[in-house]
Regions:
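Aromatic-lined carbohydrate-binding/catalytic grooves of carbohydrate-active enzymes
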Residues: 76-86, 94, 135, 339-372
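Catalytic domains of carbohydrate-active enzymes, especially glycoside hydrolases
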Residues: 60-79, 125, 327-353, 412-423, ...
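Aromatic-lined carbohydrate-recognition surfaces of secreted/lumenal glycan-active proteins
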Residues: 230, 237, 387-403, 450-489, ...
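Substrate-binding cleft of secreted/luminal carbohydrate-active enzymes
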Residues: 37, 260, 264, 342-343, ...
Length: 609
């Protein structure tokens, strides 16, 4: 772009700007020094539709220009990566209200539209480049942005000379999916262990780590060669990053990692920085509101989100072939899509011989025989087809003679399912002694609580290195209280929530309505901050008796009335799915419009099979 055109574009954009008015969100409380928020953009075009554009990540040139105009007059202070590095190493403080702007993928608009705006407003930004896209591996880039619509190294160097543009790696060639299960799903290349179809196996840890390290080193070396400076950051494609990847990135020479789609405030010593993903062609006013929301909510809003869930055994989707299993999965997802809940809890182990101990798994593991490898496929399809957050439930003691087995199983689950939404440990009645007035301080009970707490922490430690940080996976503990003896339940919950994101209480309340309501009255004494982190599960009736189903329905409504918004049912199956839809749709569904009601998506007479 020549200077004359740059000036003309700047003048044209300036004429479209809106005056700074009261509609823009104003900071009421400053972001502290040495803290930073980050917004992420992608392509910038003149013709982005106000709604329903072909690219949900694109923003209209006018909207970005108006945002820059507002930003330059606001209390926000745009900073560089260099500023964060100096704050880390030299103790040079970041200003109040620091903001880091990032643009991913290296679309041509980085040079033709964003760069002129940076110069006009003297605002710095970071651009994340998939280096192989600039070196001829253009297929994925052209599919995303169109033929020839990527920046080249000459343009990148011109931007760098201005001092307003810094460049980070977006990997060399990890901006795509890789085969992640035998059924054929492709998932983010960085966090997924590849399924090697010709060998009918997954990558080993060593193979996976070497593949990622080789890619990052190559991208690092390309950026250093082309730009003459040591690159500082890796911006992970799709925001897919975990603790294992953080360490590999540091080996490759990257001191900063960036995730995606996760709102929050960053501190200068964070290893991975959260970035808020801008979508749907946000206006300047909406972008200013986004910044204010980040300041006001931060991480604590994570617990305010409702969870309406069904819990089921994964073995119900098993079959003699993957094709037959897929048919079962497809029908399940159709039913959940009709129900309009938002969370699915799967139990991926099974007790085949009925001895009370789990002896087979439905995911790749060396800890016990694998009956069928269907967990990853089920999880991915539930997320992408039915909009379900998927939580995996493991018994605290799958096998009594192996006290630490659950931690090893959780590790394998997380390795091959980095995008899961949570892991729930089922402690059953193990802590019921701590809910009773008379036994709270007895030595046996205290020891039992201590052992379970240690095992819980060990399990979290085993799984966390593999979980995608952008997904904000949560750890929960499932308890089955005795409704007759729960005097100390509130005190126990407060204690457990110091080690768990959530605590789930399961009740079989059919025929015990009085005791159940008393339990709810006890839970209602808790402050809202605790209620936000409590899940309640009701066991489904084993028969079709209308009265029993009506009791469960009323129980779910009663849960809502005391301000608990995370609730669901256990024992979901093809046989009772129609009854769930018939009796429990109103409390379970998150559908707020009768116009959007979906009828039951089951096959005729399926429940009679």
């Amino acid at each position: 772009m020549n200077n004359l055109f740059s000036k003309m574009l700047g003048c044209a954009l300036a004429s479209t700007l809106l005056p700074l008015q009261f509609a823009y969100a104003q900071i009421e409380k400053d972001l502290p020094k040495n803290h930073v928020v980050s917004l992420t953009f992608h392509d910038v075009r003149d013709d982005v539709l106000k709604e329903g554009d072909r690219d949900i990540y694109a923003i209209q040139t006018k909207n970005l220009a108006q945002f820059f105009d507002w930003l330059s007059q606001s209390e926000w202070k745009p900073i560089r990566l260099k500023d964060i590095e100096e704050a880390r190493k030299q103790g040079k403080e970041l200003p109040h209200n620091a903001i880091l702007l990032t643009f991913d993928d290296g679309a041509l608009s980085s040079y033709s539209r964003i760069f002129p705006l940076l110069k006009q407003y003297q605002i710095p930004a970071v651009f994340a480049l998939p280096t192989s896209w600039l070196n001829g591996n253009t297929k994925a880039g052209y599919e995303a942005y169109g033929q020839g619509n990527l920046v080249n190294w000459k343009q990148v160097r011109e931007m760098q000379v201005s001092g307003l543009a810094e460049f980070a790696s977006h990997s060399d060639d990890l901006h795509h999916g890789v085969l992640a299960n035998p059924q054929g799903n492709e998932q983010p290349a960085a966090t997924s262990y590849m399924y090697l179809k010709s060998q009918a196996r997954y990558e080993t840890d060593a193979e996976y780590q070497q593949r990622i390290l080789n890619d990052l080193k190559k991208s690092h070396d390309v950026l250093k060669k082309e730009l003459g400076v040591e690159p500082k950051a890796i911006v992970w494609p799709y925001g897919a990053v975990n603790q294992q990847l953080e360490k590999i990135a540091q080996q490759a020479g990257f001191n900063f990692s960036f995730s995606l789609g996760r709102d929050g405030v960053n501190q200068i010593n964070d290893v991975t920085f959260k970035r808020s993903l801008m979508v749907d062609n946000s206006t300047a006013e909406q972008l200013s509101e986004t910044l204010l929301n980040i300041l006001n909510s931060a991480e604590k809003d994570l617990y305010k989100q409702p969870k309406h869930f069904v819990s089921m055994d994964l073995k119900q989707l098993a079959a003699l072939s993957n094709t037959q299993s897929d048919e079962k999965l497809g029908l399940l997802l159709s039913k959940l899509y009709s129900l309009k809940n938002n969370t699915l809890i799967l139990k991926p182990l099974d007790d085949q011989d009925g001895d009370g101990q789990d002896d087979v798994a439905y995911f790749p593991t060396t800890q016990m025989p694998v009956k069928q490898d269907i967990l990853n496929r089920s999880l991915w399809q539930a997320q992408t087809r039915a909009g379900q957050a998927v939580i995996l439930e493991l018994p605290i003691y799958p096998q009594k003679n192996k006290p630490f087995l659950v931690a090893d199983l959780a590790k394998d689950i997380a390795r091959f399912n980095s995008n899961l939404s949570g892991i729930q440990l089922n402690a059953g009645t193990a802590l019921n002694c701590a809910m009773q007035n008379t036994t709270l301080n007895e030595s046996n009970c205290v020891q039992q609580v201590k052992q379970l707490s240690q095992l819980n922490q060990l399990t979290q430690k085993a799984a966390k290195p593999y979980l995608n940080m952008s997904n904000q996976a949560q750890f929960s503990l499932l308890l089955t209280p005795d409704l007759e003896h729960i005097e100390q339940l509130p005190a126990l919950l407060k204690s457990l929530l110091t080690q768990n994101d959530l605590v789930n209480l399961k009740f079989n309340m059919v025929g015990k309505q009085k005791q159940f309501k008393q339990a709810l009255e006890l839970l209602n004494t808790l402050d809202a901050k605790y209620k936000q982190r409590i899940m309640l599960t009701l066991t489904l009736p084993e028969n079709d008796q209308k009265n029993a189903w009506q009791e469960v329905k009323q129980g779910l409504f009663d849960i809502q009335r005391i301000g608990i918004q995370k609730f669901g049912v256990d024992g979901y199956s093809p046989k009772n799915s129609k009854s769930v839809h018939q009796y429990l749709y109103n409390p379970m569904s998150l559908n707020s419009s009768s116009v959007m009601y979906q009828p039951f998506a089951g096959l005729a007479n399926e429940g009679k099979k």
